Design a protein with these regions (language model features):
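Short, charged/polar micro-motifs that form catalytic or ligand-binding hotspots
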Residues: 11, 15, 27-39, 43, ...
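Amphipathic alpha-helical scaffolding segments
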Residues: 42-47, 61-64, 127-134
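Generic structural signal for well-ordered, non-membrane alpha-helices
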Residues: 23, 47, 108-112
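Hydrophobic alpha-helical packing segments in soluble, helical-rich domains
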Residues: 38-55
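Polyanionic, low-complexity intrinsically disordered segments
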Residues: 135-216
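A broadly used, surface-exposed interaction patch
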Residues: 5-8, 15, 53-108
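Charged alpha-helical initiation segments
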Residues: 1-36, 40, 148-169
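Charge-enriched, short contiguous segments at helix-coil
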Residues: 92-148
């Protein structure tokens, strides 16, 4: 057991809301309640991914909205959504294929550990899921992949009604997008912005052209 280690993991958490449940996991860890800690860690993993899907949907992302509607419908029907949330997170590129495989492995262990007479939960089991929980989602803010950046701009161009009319609202709209784009993806962003600006000028589409200039 390494108390300092779990505290270091906590320092990597991006969202303060996640820290609340993480503190309960730490309490389980300190008190050697490894089974309870494991199950709480699984819950936090799923809830963190779910929040990112909702966040993506709130930004009018088509895949985010589709996946969230599916999850929401399952919740309304009182169905288990853990596996669907994981799959939806992969579909929205919130997690990679490798991370999806890791989460499936954690899910299988969670199902075993949920039955107290089947297998003892060791400190190493709890440490493992905590490390993956932090690596896969808690330490990562929601961000857009290259493909998602291209899709977002394509959606804006083909559905210009989503562009706010007020210039200040346009600025806020753009800031919401930029927060989700990593610096390493800026070249992809600007390449697409200049491409759509050129096309808008050729088509005399002043609305799109003005928006692209503001974005740039």
């Amino acid at each position: 057991m390494d108390i300092n280690w779990v505290e270091i993991q906590k320092s990597q958490i991006c969202n303060n809301d996640d820290a609340i449940l993480y503190n309960e996991i730490v309490a389980c860890y300190k008190n050697k309640l490894y089974r309870s800690g494991y199950l709480l860690a699984w819950i936090l993993l799923i809830e963190s991914l779910k929040r990112k899907i909702i966040e993506l949907a709130s930004l009018d992302d088509s895949r985010g909205k589709t996946e969230w509607q599916l999850i929401e419908q399952m919740e309304q029907n009182h169905q288990s959504t853990d596996c669907q949330i994981t799959l939806s997170a992969k579909e929205c590129e919130i997690i990679s294929d490798t991370e999806f495989t890791t989460i499936n492995s954690l899910w299988q262990q969670r199902c075993i550990f949920a039955h107290p007479y089947m297998q003892e939960v060791k400190v190493s089991d709890l440490e493992y899921i905590i490390s993956k929980l932090v690596d896969i989602t808690l330490s990562k803010p929601l961000s857009l992949s290259k493909k998602m950046i291209e899709e977002r701009l394509d959606e804006i161009v083909n559905s210009p009604h989503v562009i706010p009319v007020n210039p200040d609202e346009q600025n806020n709209f753009i800031k919401q997008q930029l927060v989700l784009i990593k610096e390493k993806h800026y070249p992809v962003l600007y390449k697409n912005l200049f491409f759509y600006l050129s096309k808008a000028r050729e088509a005399n589409n002043n609305t799109i052209a003005a928006f692209m200039r503001r974005y740039i």
